[in-house]
Amino acid sequence: KASDFAAYEKKKPFKQAEKSQEEHKEQEELWQMENWNREDLDGVEKKKKDSKPNNREVKKMVYSFRGGIHPGTHADPGYKSATNTKPIEKLALPDEVILPVSMHIGAPAKPIVSVGDTVDLGQPIAEAGGFVSAPVHATVSGKVKAIEPRLHPNGSKVLSIVITNDGEDRPHESVHPYDFASMSNEERIECIRSAGIVGHGGATFPTHVKIQSGIGKCDTVIINAAECEPYITSDHRLLLERPEETIGGLKMLADLMGVQNAIIAIEENKADTFPKIEQLIADDPRLHLYPLKCKYPQGAEKQLINACTGREVPSGKLPADAGCAVFNVDTAGAIYRRFTTGMPVIRRVVTISGSAVAEPKNLEARIGTPIGMRMRDVFEACGGFKEAPNKLLAGGPMMGNAQFSLDAPVVKGTNAFLAFAGDEDKRVKDPQCIRCGKCINACPMHLLPIYMNVYGKQEDLDNAVDCGMMDCIECGSCAYVCPARIPLVAQFRLTKGKIQAKRMAERAKAEAEKKKAEAEAAAKAENK
């Protein structure tokens, strides 16, 4: 309402008289979005759906979503200052690489080489184990040393192919450029599938599956350049140093999926990437740059779609059901490199940071090296630890996996290795909820964490589901703002596991009863 907005404006550090009418209107829209009044917001969402502003117009509006948190400090939002100005450095080749056959969501890949085989750079060494799967390629040339379970960043032991590096980097005969323009869609998708390209943002969903399921359903492609996780700056540096790869991949995706609206969404704290991005997209009217408010989890798929298009992904559905397909910065880059060089997924840029790291950096070994390098090698390249780390993470501090060993390899979904000193790992024994409601305000999915936690502890699974337990994206916003320091996400993961186990048991019981009924019916028919 205008009266509420006037009161809100008085609290702002700028004077209303200094703002133009157009700026006033834009600020009002942002105010409505942050305060989430359903009736007021409908008009803003309708405007987003019905209009496709050009690049110059869209730059004036900052897009966001309701809820979320602001990790970091005023001087250092997101704790990114340690590495956001550090150029990508290439790491020396390791003596051996460890390549898990499961670096993606879906069925593990199946090894197609044997111990003692000589392999070349980019050679397929494991084939996809199903439709939702991805092949694995040799990231160095050399000899297969072992095929055995090795430690994975997820904490388990996974069948892995260990290759001893011969230092020659002989490219495999299958590595050659492809003519994207002359290929059919089926050939393009097969080319992406055979390259082992998966989501590089952490989810590692096979890219060819996302593309194939989205063709005909999606009218918008979004490149997720939010990189909202604290400390991580690998995507930021890629956009600064190799923006042509990401934009080239975005154009290919737009052609492949037949969409006329292709968005690259970047948080405001990466504004130094805007000039080059605008220059690269200026000649293609399908492409748009959308600045995003610096907020976590702005990069979560559902929140990003809502911020950019005003659409909401229905509960239990996929982004394609909202007409959108979302890809990571380096996923788009991997697609571009596949067609222009023929190289499959064999490298990864990783941010190394945290209070215990001597020299925080953004690291990438020369082509073919990072996938399979050990965590220990990566930290040593950053000068080791300036003090003993109390917490090691693969990924960001909000959604990453805690590590108990430095021997886990870099995999396709690894975007950071973080090491923190003891004073940053604060725990409370037997925390008690004070019912302040901060977790509800922070939840980007509009859930009720306060009740989800209670039902989870009581193992009241039906009520937990009714509160939206299975819609939780485990972003950690609720746990971050909790003054009692309750490990909410840990409880939610445990409860979701119980719900899934219950559903599987119910399905198995129903199938057994169905088979029993069919057998009884068949027996009666025989008796007749």
Where are these regions (language model features)?
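Conserved hydrophobic positions within beta-strands
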Residues: G142-V144
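Ferredoxin-type iron-sulfur electron-transfer modules in oxidoreductases and energy-metabolism complexes
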Residues: T414-D430, I440, P444-A523
